[in-house]
UniProtKB/Swiss-Prot annotation:
It comes from Hydrogenobacter thermophilus (strain DSM 6534 / IAM 12695 / TK-6). Pfam families: AsnC_trans_reg2, NirdL-like_HTH. The gene is nirDL. H.thermophilus possesses the fused nirDL gene but lacks the genes encoding NirG and NirH. GO terms for molecular function: lyase activity. Belongs to the Ahb/Nir family. Its EC number is 4.1.1.111. The active site is at residue 93. It comes from the Bacteria. This is Siroheme decarboxylase. Changing residue 226 to Q: Does not affect didecarboxysiroheme production. Cannot bind the substrate analog Fe-URO III.
Length: 334
């Protein structure tokens, strides 16, 4: 299959268009029949190369409060604590990384539940974790995984548009709730959603387009199993960057294809790094070389690479469900 296979993998990681027959549009771009494209995508899912295809929503613009959390856990207790963290419906990613703070997870807390810091404190107390970090986003430079490069040092342009939060209507929340699952692999996928929402296909596409215009809907795309797609190494790369240089350095780092996420985050006395980038490569040496290149080019002497050694959890959060509230009630009553 070769080149055709690569084209399909590349195109479904970008942005599935908001039109009645999106797979027909993609099939034309690849140069194959729509039916063949759909069968190939189904096979990629079955073979464990594609993790899922789904709408990707911005948790902040949905009204959720989120942060990157790090726990310092005794090695003999790591799996136990990781399993506890995994049970939280607001945790989408949870990894063991090569650092004294060895358990890193992303947490999103629904509006009107509790303060995020209180949730983290209760989680830490429950598992007797004495040392932890709450690292919030200050500035976003890049977000979006596209594993379609030979070298992580390849460059690309990045959309840096900043969106303002406006509360969602109840109808918009329902649209998010219904569409956030796996994207239907049929000729008219939006019609499947529209039937469940009891609205016309045209009306749904119009409303999804409006959500995309506001940044609430980032895109609809495939997420791959990195290792099975050949990208066996990933690291959270962190730098200590002077405040007056962080905009320039952040944009520079975000321009590398091997960087999927790049943020400025809040710091702590225990963790002074303020610029974070997730790097992916076909081996650790590729990532080390890219981090060294960035550090040398931008004269940054203080940096670290936190390689992922174990993936404990990687899922999509179910927005506007009652799962988090039930879990939180159990947490505070324990």
């Amino acid at each position: 299959m070769g080149n055709e296979f690569d084209k399909i993998l590349k195109i479904i990681q970008k942005d599935i268009p908001l039109v009645k027959e999106p797979f027909s549009v993609l099939a034309q771009e690849v140069g194959i029949e729509e039916g063949k494209l759909l069968k190939t995508i189904e096979k990629l899912v079955e073979d464990g190369i594609v993790r899922h295809i789904a709408p990707i929503y911005d948790s902040r613009l949905l009204g959720y409060d989120s942060a990157l959390i790090a726990f310092k856990v005794d090695r003999q207790k790591l799996e136990e604590v990781a399993n506890f963290v995994n049970a939280c419906p607001g945790v989408s990613h949870n990894y063991e990384r090569t650092h004294d703070f060895n358990l890193w997870f992303t947490l999103a807390v629904p509006p009107e539940i509790s303060e995020l810091e209180d949730v983290v404190r209760l989680m830490a107390e429950r598992e007797r974790v004495k040392d932890y970090l709450v690292l919030r986003v200050v500035r976003l430079f890049k977000i979006g995984v596209k594993l379609d490069y030979e070298s992580p040092a390849e460059k690309e342009s990045v959309d840096t548009k900043v969106y303002t939060y406006t509360p969602l209507t109840e109808e918009e929340k329902r649209i998010v709730s219904i569409t956030q699952g796996s994207f239907p692999l049929v000729e008219r996928p939006f019609l499947e959603y529209a039937k469940r929402l009891r609205m016309s296909e045209e009306e749904l596409l119009e409303k999804l387009s409006a959500l995309k215009e506001r940044g609430v809907l980032r895109r609809i795309s495939a997420v791959l199993y990195h290792r099975r797609a050949g990208y066996v190494a990933n690291a959270m790369s962190v730098w200590e960057v002077p405040e007056d240089a962080i905009e320039e350095v952040g944009r520079y780092i975000a321009g590398f294809k091997g960087v999927s996420h790049c943020y400025q985050r809040t710091t702590s006395e225990k963790f002074r790094y303020n610029l974070f980038a997730m790097m992916h490569g076909k081996g650790q040496e590729e990532i080390k070389l890219l981090a060294e290149t960035i550090s040398r080019e931008k004269a940054l002497s203080k940096y670290a690479l936190l390689f992922s050694t174990r993936e404990f959890k990687k899922v999509r959060i179910k927005y506007f469900s009652e799962e988090f509230e039930r879990w939180f009630k159990e947490l505070i009553s324990a």
